[in-house]
């Protein structure tokens, strides 16, 4: 059976379709059972169809699906409070994917710089081997030119330094830098763990320069490193954290987490309960 031509060929899909799954196993159309090593590419943190996840989704789906951000969302507040209680962050913004989380993190960093008199601080420093998503801006944050090929001019304001090399960072850091964006463990770059002490040095240099540190935990976060967040393995507190994948266990959700003063720089930017002419 061939893949439907109605689907854009954006991915090199294997011609296997699964009908259901349980725990670590998937079952294909022909009944063949597979041990799932991919886990939805670091998404299915609790396996397939975990009873508690199924129960939570079915319960909520039977009560209310969507209201918009015009109103309080109690369940959203509950999750945000749990994330804050178990991290160095104070504020949480929810989105739908990892790319939205990383791009949102960059927006928050630049907005914070702008709100604090640093309008010239727009540059984001990234590392070689980095992968931060596939939105137009994040294509520029990624290191590999292949990802950017054919998509026109790259978004401005991204500089790459050698992964693990502090000296290359020191050569480009300056008052034009809004933030350093880093994966504690690179995924697309080959499952590379940051060298011992590297994150601590990044954090120190960012602080000395008045820049922010963004920890991209989209793939490595939510317990995959042995701690809830990978940054917790070193004595640092990033200013912003990008989160997704395992956060929803298969349900599409991402989050931008930030320190209070950083997150508050973007408050009421898009909508307000007040009338427009008030």
Task: Annotate each language-model stretch with its function.
Residues 80-179:
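PLP-dependent aspartate aminotransferase-fold enzymes
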Residues 136, 227, 235-266:
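Active-site PLP attachment segment
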Residues 192-226:
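Catalytic PLP-binding core of fold-type I/II PLP enzymes
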Residues 177-190:
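Short acidic, glycine-rich surface-loop motifs adjacent to enzyme active sites
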Residues 270-277:
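Conserved small/polar residues in nucleotide/adenosyl-binding loops
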Residues 5, 33-119, 123:
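Glycine-rich loop-to-alpha-helix module at the N-terminal edge of alpha/beta enzyme cores
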